[in-house]
Amino acid sequence: MPKHDRLHRPGVIATRAAVHPATQARLAAKRYRFPALATMPRPIPSGLISGSNRIYRSAPRRGDEIAEALAGILCRGGGSVLITSSRRTHAAGLALLREQLGGFSTASLDGSGENLYFAYLGLADTVLVAGDYVAMVSEAAGTGKPVPILNLDGGNAKFARFHVAMRAAGITRPFCGRIEGWSDPVPDDTKRVGAALHLFALGRRKRA
């Protein structure tokens, strides 16, 4: 259970990030499975874009700012961009993003065909993530790459606790309009929870 939920109960394992399947082994296996992606010009920032929910609001201006920032990154340093949207991403905003990035080497997930999400994470040099999605932030952190956070309007105390903890650990930073390189410590929450559950299962077998 993530610490920011503050559900302290016997038998509950507290984690900083969400438990997720974006392991280093899975990302490595997916990384070069798709030749067309593997040959895209580098550097490759990947943008994980969501949308409005009951806590956060993704205003149209934020879509413009994200597209402008990504285009600026490509203009200054070249490379490619990989875009992942969610079910909450506004279709108009996503279309605008694609239009503004149309002159660059881009690829985006639209929910059709094979899911390339883990390939995108594995190939990215930097993973920009919308701050309203704990799971996406946690999966991006599993890459060990820099994870700048795209701030949205809104939020609450629970999300604030999560982001403060991730920044304090050196895992994420606020996105400031440019790509910064830093050493991103990979959270060990998934391994730690898996090991604890394994020990618990072994204990039950011995008592049976």
Outline where the language-model segments fall.
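A nucleotide-sugar donor-handling region in carbohydrate enzymes
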Residues: 1-62, 175-187, 191
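Short, charged/polar "capping" segments at the starts of alpha-helices
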Residues: 55-56, 89-95, 155-158
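Short hydrophobic signal-anchor/transmembrane segments that target glycosyltransferases
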Residues: 62-77
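Catalytic donor nucleotide-activated moiety binding site of glycosyltransferases and closely related
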Residues: 78-111
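Conserved active-site histidine-acidic residue motif and adjacent donor-binding/catalytic loop
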Residues: 110-118
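A donor-sugar binding/catalytic signature common to diverse glycosyltransferases
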Residues: 117-159
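C-terminal amphipathic helix plus adjacent low-complexity
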Residues: 156-208
